[in-house]
Amino acid sequence: VNTSEKAGFDLMQDPGVPYISNISFCGAQTSFDRTQAGKEGKGSLGYSGSELEGMKIAGNTFDYPFIHGKAIQAAGKYSFVSCSDEAVENGLVTLEDYPVVDYILGLEKEDPASKAYYKTFSSAMQRIMTSYCQAGGNLFVSGAYVGSDMSGTQGNREFTEKILKYGYQGSLTDKSSNQIKGLGRTITIPRLPNESSYAVPAVDCIVPVDTAFPVFTYAPGNLSAGIAYKGNYRTFVLGFPFESIQSEADRATIMAGILGFFTQK
């Protein structure tokens, strides 16, 4: 937060993603009033709570291909390899060589304030994935900003709607809701900072387009959390990170369902 009237770090809106873990937070900042700078006590600029004291907050552990791969392995009869998106964009890896592609986005999104470029689908990746789908591929995508990060331009929206077969309906920022229903299960994801896995402060509500259909909904309510499409190619897209599903058993069951959807005749 950096305006003429307010300053600070709003952990309730976005707690950030620590490198591996973070022990430096004592609590969420509660006072952002610039006129209270230089003062002490409750209400002063920068005053915060104490709810995070003693907590080793989980961050980016850089092992998400392993987490996804473990779920793939549990499904049986499948092998997997992993690579960076840059390897695909630079032509070092060809998606058409693989019957199924799992595109892991996590909390990646474009941020004008960041020096690093973390666009969910770069222009190059859009072209590559379009070719892969048109060749009859099976594409699994998961991430918290698959809709919101692609809603700004008509070209980006056309890619998600015409190729991946989903539209963006808004972001769910109510952190009291951490349950998602689908594939016969009720799963949970962490919405607040914790010691187990990175927090997902906002998730995307994505709706099916064309002949796609909803496969997950946020609970309570019925906002769509994931879609699947079956045509000349197949897509399965989640508006939340797959690796944020807290139960390993749930991840294995859901991955088996996704792979089954891709391979069934």
What do the PLM-derived regions correspond to, one by one?
Residues 1-5, 98-110, 143-144, 238-240:
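Short loop/turn segments at strand-loop or loop-helix junctions that form parts
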Residues 53-59, 103-120, 241:
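The substrate-binding groove and active-site-proximal loops of carbohydrate-active enzymes
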Residues 1-100, 233, 244, 256-265:
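Aromatic-Pro/Gly-enriched surface loop or interdomain linker
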Residues 108-213, 220, 254:
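A glycine-rich, often tryptophan-bearing local segment used as a flexible ligand/cofactor-contacting loop or short
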Residues 73, 93-97, 132-135, 207-209, ...:
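Extracellular/periplasmic catalytic domains that process cell-envelope and extracellular macromolecules
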Residues 73, 103-106, 130, 134, ...:
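Sec-exported extracytoplasmic/periplasmic mature domains
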Residues 85-92, 123-128, 220-225:
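Alpha-helical scaffolding within the catalytic cores
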Residues 1, 6-21, 137-139, 193-265:
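A glycine-centered loop/beta-turn motif at secondary-structure junctions
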